[in-house]
């Protein structure tokens, strides 16, 4: 199965909450101790279903449950984002950062998936906004990032933007060529209880992480 262009897959109550909570607590505790979560790449064949909580989530997400271009996916780049009130994740596109920095060329993953680990409460703001009008090629041009970010912040879901509210234990899979942002969090996320998203980008080759 492949995701059609402009398509997005959303699955709620995706995994057992005990695994979600273990990953949430691990990431949050490390952050409180100022331990960096280093982004990493792992080949699909090397994912240990009995490993740590992140390995288990990877395996359950992409090996056990998703059958999206399984024959093309070589492995996954993994990172996280912790966001609190007033934070915004500005317009960007997921890409091979090493290739972008060394050759000034944008190469996208096959797909981006993000799993929301916490908080358990809802948020005011903190939505994932996917642009259906602009593509990664537009980001190479002289476009006004601020105005497009503002457009995404204020848009409602329609032909130009798809806005996906935050929800605990929600998995979102989308076309990585789509520019996206996270809208400003106005309520519901704090330093003690931030919005945590675990991102797993599916690649058809091994990328170098920075």
What are these regions (language model features)?
Residues 1-81, 86-89, 127:
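Non-heme Fe(II)/2-oxoglutarate
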């Amino acid at each position: 199965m492949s995701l059609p262009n402009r398509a997005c897959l959303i699955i709620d109550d995706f995994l057992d909450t005990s695994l979600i909570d273990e990953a949430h607590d691990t990431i949050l505790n490390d952050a409180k101790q100022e331990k960096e979560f280093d982004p990493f790449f792992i080949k699909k064949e090397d994912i240990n279903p009995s490993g740590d909580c992140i390995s288990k989530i990877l395996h359950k997400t992409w090996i056990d449950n998703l059958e999206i271009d399984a024959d093309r996916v070589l492995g996954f780049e993994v990172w996280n984002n912790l966001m609190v009130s007033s934070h915004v994740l500005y317009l960007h596109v997921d890409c091979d950062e090493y290739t972008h920095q060394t050759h000034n060329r944008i190469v996208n993953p096959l797909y981006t998936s993000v799993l929301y680990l916490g908080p358990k409460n809802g948020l005011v703001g903190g939505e994932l906004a996917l642009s259906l009008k602009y593509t990664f090629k537009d980001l190479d041009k002289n476009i006004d990032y601020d105005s497009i970010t503002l457009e995404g912040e204020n848009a409602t879901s329609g032909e130009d933007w798809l806005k996906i509210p935050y929800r605990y234990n929600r998995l979102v899979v989308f076309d990585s060529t789509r520019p996206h942002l996270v809208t400003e969090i106005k309520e519901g996320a704090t330093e003690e209880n931030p919005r945590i998203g675990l991102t797993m980008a599916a690649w058809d080759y091994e990328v170098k992480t920075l």
